[in-house]
Amino acid sequence: MHSIINSEAYPIHRYDDPQTLQLIATAQSELTSTGACHFPQFLSPFGLSACLQEALTLESQAHASNNQYTPYYREPDDTYPKGHPQNSTVRFAVRYVSRKLLSEDSPIRMLFEGDDLLTFIRDLLPGEPLYRYSDPRGSLNYTVMAWNDQLGWHFDACE
C-alpha cells in the first residue's frame, strides 16, 4: 500500500512519526476552521495512475443512476417553504464502479481495507468512532461521469 500513497509526504504507516503527528494536527486545525481538510498529492504518481487505469478498465461496467433528490437524498418535503433544501431537488446523473467489481489487488481496495488509512483518519477525528462502510454498492466506488452527467450539491451520507 505504501506505493499507492505518497508516503514521503504522508507517512501514515508510521503512526508516531513527528511528520505524521504534524499532519494530523494540521488537518485537525483545518477541520476546526473550515470544516474540511486537504491532502494535496496524497496518492503517489504510481497510485494515481493505477487507480485511473482501474477506473477506465471498469468504466463500461458502471451502474448508471439518474435521479432527482433533495441534497439529503430524500424526496422533497412540501411542508418546507419553496427553495428550502428539504423541498428542492438536484439532479444525480452519474455512474458508479462499485466495490463488488474491484479485484482483491485493486489499489483503491487495498487503501480502503488497509489499517493505515483508517488509523490515520481515526487519529485526526479523536473521540469519533470510525468504521468502514460495508455496503458493496455504496462503499468504495469510482464515480464515472460522462457528458451531461451531474452530481448535484448534496450532503455525503458515507465515507
Per-segment meaning from a language model:
Residues 100-109, 113-159:
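Catalytic core of non-heme Fe(II) oxygenases with the double-stranded beta-helix
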Residues 2-33, 40-120:
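Non-heme Fe(II)-dependent double-stranded beta-helix
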Residues 36-38, 142:
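Conserved hydrophobic/aromatic beta-strand scaffold that supports enzyme active sites
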